[in-house]
């Protein structure tokens, strides 16, 4: 579902860019009505892009909220990071979030963190 919003944002951004190029080519004196029409469409596109970006960010938040609701979470040690396969096999349903991923940045993580329904 996130891909739908992403593709729509891209399509609208491309249309907005095309409108900006059309406006640059128009003369305000000769084509004032066409310029005003493009300006109006530009405003609606900018509003729609802003709305879609908000929807896109809220979807990331839902995923982050789901992880934060999990009863157990803790930082993953360097030793555990070295043998991640063993850790994931020993803890059923473990989700590991790296701080440099979009989800990790959104959650404000400082270190690699594991989320699970069971203690680990």
UniProtKB/Swiss-Prot annotation:
Keywords: Cytoplasm. Its main location: cytoplasm. It holds the Pfam family DUF2810. One of its GO terms (cellular component) is cytosol. It is found in: Cytoplasm. This is Uncharacterized protein YibL. The lineage of its organism: Bacteria, Pseudomonadati, Pseudomonadota, Gammaproteobacteria, Enterobacterales. The gene is yibL.
């Amino acid at each position: 579902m996130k891909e739908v919003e992403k593709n729509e944002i891209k399509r609208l951004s491309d249309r907005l860019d095309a409108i900006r190029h059309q406006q640059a080519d128009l003369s305000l004196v000769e084509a004032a009505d066409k310029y005003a029409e493009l300006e109006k469409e530009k405003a609606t596109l900018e509003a729609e892009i802003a709305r879609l970006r908000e929807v896109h960010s809220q979807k990331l938040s839902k995923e982050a909220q789901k992880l934060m609701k999990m009863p157990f979470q803790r930082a993953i040690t360097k030793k555990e990071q070295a043998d991640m396969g063993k850790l994931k096999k020993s803890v059923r349903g473990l989700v590991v979030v790296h701080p440099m991923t979009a989800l990790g940045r959104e959650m404000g993580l400082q270190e690699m963190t594991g989320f699970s329904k069971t203690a680990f």
